[in-house]
C-alpha cells in the first residue's frame, strides 16, 4: 500500500479519535489487512462541524478567482498522483487498476468543471417598477455534510466535494468504513494544495453515530448522500427537525432494453462493459435485460460468448473483473440465483463463487448469465449489485416499457434501437432520471446525474449539480433621494 494517512482530519490537523480505536481495512482480493483507520464518534464529529462552521465566512468571501485557482491545483495534483491514487483504490476496493485510474482522472475533471462553472453561477435582475431593482443572488449554503459509498471511493467524494467547495461551502465528509483510504488520499492533496484549515474535514467511524450527529446539527445546512434507499430514508427522516437542504442518490435497478432493430454487436458490447464494470457494484448497472423475442436467440448466443471471455482476478493484475467488496455480497447473489432457478430460470454461464488457487482468498464470483427470468423471481425487483445478467423476453414495445417501469427505483435506464420515432417515445416513457439511448455513458461532469421515485432526488454534476449547493436570495432595492 502506498503511504497514506489513516487519521481523522479536523480543522487542518491529522488526529486520532478520542478513544484511540481503529478499524481494519481489508483487501477484498485476498483478505489481507492493509490499514488501520482512526475512528470518530459524536464528539469528534461535532468538532469537525464546528471547524467547518468557523471556516465558512472566510472561505465564502474568498475572491472567486483565488478559489478557482486552488481547485485547479487540486485537480493538477490528482492527475500528477493518479497512479498512486489508483493503486490505493484498487487495494481497498478491488476494482481493476485501469478502472481506478479512470475514476481518479474523472475526479480531477470534476474539480476542473466545478471550478470553471463557479464563474457562471449567474444571479438575475428581474424587471421592476420605476426606482426599484429586483436582484437575485446565489450564495453558498454553509456547512455541507457528505456521506459517500464504497463502490466509488474516490469518484463519489469528488462529485460531491468539488461543487460544494467551488460554490463557497465548507465540508464534513464521512466516507464508507470499508474504503476510506481514497478519501484520505484526496484530503492529503487538499492539504498540499493549501486548502485553508477547517474548510474540509473528514471523520470515519460508526455510520449511525456520525450520521445522527450530522443530521441533528443545526449548523449543518446541507446533506448529500449516496447509498442505499433504506439508509437514505433514515437520513431524510433524521434531517426533518433541522430542515436541511438534501440530495439523495439511492438505489437503482436499471432496465436495458434491446429492440428487434438494434445494432446487436453494440448492444452486447455495451451491456457487458456496463454490467461488469466494478463487478456490477454500480447503482446505474444494467440489472434487468429485456430482449425482443425475434432476436433473443442470436443476442443470447453472442452475449454468453462475450461474457465467457472475461478474466476475473486481483485488480492489480491484467483482469476485466475484480472481487466483490464483502462476503455478504456473495451470499446475496447466491440467494437470488437459487430463488430464480427454483422458479424456472436457467443459468447459461457462471452461477457461483470462483474457487481454487488465489480465488479462495478473496470474494470472487463467476460472471453469470441467467435466462428465462420472470416477475415471480426476486431478481426482477431486487437490485443485485453483482456480476449477474438476467434475461427477460418481451414481444411488444409497450410490454417492454411497462416491465421496465415496474420497479420502485428510477435512476438509470438504457435501450437500443435504430428507430428515431421509438427513441422519442421510449425515452419519454421510461420513468427514470437518466436514459441511455444506444449509449451507456450517462455520467459526465457536464450532465445531470440523479433519479426519481425511490432512487432519490437532487442532481449531481453539471450546472444542476452546482445549484444543489447554493441558496437563492432576493433583494428588493428602492432608490431614494
Regions found by a protein language model. Give the residues of each.
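Rossmann-like NAD(P) dinucleotide-binding subdomain of oxidoreductase/dehydrogenase enzymes
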Residues: 123-266, 318, 394
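Conserved C-terminal structural/oligomerization subdomain of aldehyde/semialdehyde dehydrogenase
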Residues: 30-36, 220, 257, 311, ...
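Short, well-ordered beta-strand elements within core beta-sheets of diverse protein domains
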Residues: 34-40, 55-61, 146, 256-259, ...
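Hydrophobic face of amphipathic alpha-helices that form TPR/SEL1-like repeat modules
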Residues: 1-29
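Residue-level signal for inorganic ion chemistry
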Residues: 31, 67, 89, 111, ...
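Structural signal for hydrophobic packing residues in well-ordered secondary-structure cores
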Residues: 56, 60, 75-82, 86, ...
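ALDH superfamily catalytic-core signature
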Residues: 230-374, 437
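Glycine-rich loop-to-alpha-helix module at the N-terminal edge of alpha/beta enzyme cores
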Residues: 32-121, 131
Amino acid at each position: 500500500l502506498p503511504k497514506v494517512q489513516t487519521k481523522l482530519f479536523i480543522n487542518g490537523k491529522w488526529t486520532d479519535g478520542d478513544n484511540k480505536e481503529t478499524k481494519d481495512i481489508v483487501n477484498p482480493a485476498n483478505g489481507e489487512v492493509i490499514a488501520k483507520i482512526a475512528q470518530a464518534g459524536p464528539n469528534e464529529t461535532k468538532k469537525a462541524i464546528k471547524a467547518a462552521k468557523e471556516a465558512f465566512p472566510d472561505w465564502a468571501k474568498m475572491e472567486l478567482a483565488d478559489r478557482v485557482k486552488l481547485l485547479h491545483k487540486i485537480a493538477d495534483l490528482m492527475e500528477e498522483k493518479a497512479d498512486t491514487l489508483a493503486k490505493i483504490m484498487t487495494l481497498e476496493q478491488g476494482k481493476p487498476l485501469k478502472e481506478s485510474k479512470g475514476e481518479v482522472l474523472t475526479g480531477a475533471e470534476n474539480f476542473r468543471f466545478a471550478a470553471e462553472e463557479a464563474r457562471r453561477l449567474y444571479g438575475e435582475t428581474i424587471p421592476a417598477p420605476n426606482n426599484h431593482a429586483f436582484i437575485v443572488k446565489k450564495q453558498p449554503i454553509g456547512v455541507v455534510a457528505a456521506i459517500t459509498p464504497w463502490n466509488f471511493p474516490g469518484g463519489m467524494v469528488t462529485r460531491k466535494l468539488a461543487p460544494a467547495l467551488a460554490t463557497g461551502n465548507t465540508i464534513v465528509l464521512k466516507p464508507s468504513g470499508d474504503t476510506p483510504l481514497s478519501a484520505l488520499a484526496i484530503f492529503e492533496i487538499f492539504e498540499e494544495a493549501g486548502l485553508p484549515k477547517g474548510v474540509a474535514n473528514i471523520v470515519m467511524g460508526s455510520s449511525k453515530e456520525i450520521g445522527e450527529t450530522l443530521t441533528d446539527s443545526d449548523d449543518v445546512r446541507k446533506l448529500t448522500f449516496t447509498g442505499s434507499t433504506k439508509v437514505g430514508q433514515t437520513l431524510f427522516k433524521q434531517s426533518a427537525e433541522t430542515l436541511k437542504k438534501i440530495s439523495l442518490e439511492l438505489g437503482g435497478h436499471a432496465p436495458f432494453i434491446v429492440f428487434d432493430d438494434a445494432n446487436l454487436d453494440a448492444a452486447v458490447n455495451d451491456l457487458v462493459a456496463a454490467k461488469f464494470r466494478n463487478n456490477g457494484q454500480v447503482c446505474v448497472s444494467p440489472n434487468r435485460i429485456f430482449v425482443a423475442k425475434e432476436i433473443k436467440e442470436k443476442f443470447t448466443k453472442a452475449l454468453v460468448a462475450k461474457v465467457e471471455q472475461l478474466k476475473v482476478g486481483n485488480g492489480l493484475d491484467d483482469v476485466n473483473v475484480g472481487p466483490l467488496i464483502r462476503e455478504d455480497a456473495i451470499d446475496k447473489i447466491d440467494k437470488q440465483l437459487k430463488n430464480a432457478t427454483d422458479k424456472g430460470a436457467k443459468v447459461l454461464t457462471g452461477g457461483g463463487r470462483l474457487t481454487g488457487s488465489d480465488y479462495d482468498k478473496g470474494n470472487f464470483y463467476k460472471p453469470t448469465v441467467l435466462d428465462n427470468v420472470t416477475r415471480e423471481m426476486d431478481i426482477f425487483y431486487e437490485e443485485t449489485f453483482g456480476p449477474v445478467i438476467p434475461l427477460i423476453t418481451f414481444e411488444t414495445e409497450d410490454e417492454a416499457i411497462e416491465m421496465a417501469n415496474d420497479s420502485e427505483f428510477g435512476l438509470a435506464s438504457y435501450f437500443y434501437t435504430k428507430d428515431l420515432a421509438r427513441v422519442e417515445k421510449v425515452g419519454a416513457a421510461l420513468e427514470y432520471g437518466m436514459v441511455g439511448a444506444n449509449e451507456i455513458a450517462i455520467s459526465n461532469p457536464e450532465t445531470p446525474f440523479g433519479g426519481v421515485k425511490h432512487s432519490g432526488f437532487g442532481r449531481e454534476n453539471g450546472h444542476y449539480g452546482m445549484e444543489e449547493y447554493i441558496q437563492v436570495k432576493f433583494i428588493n432595492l428602492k432608490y431614494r433621494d
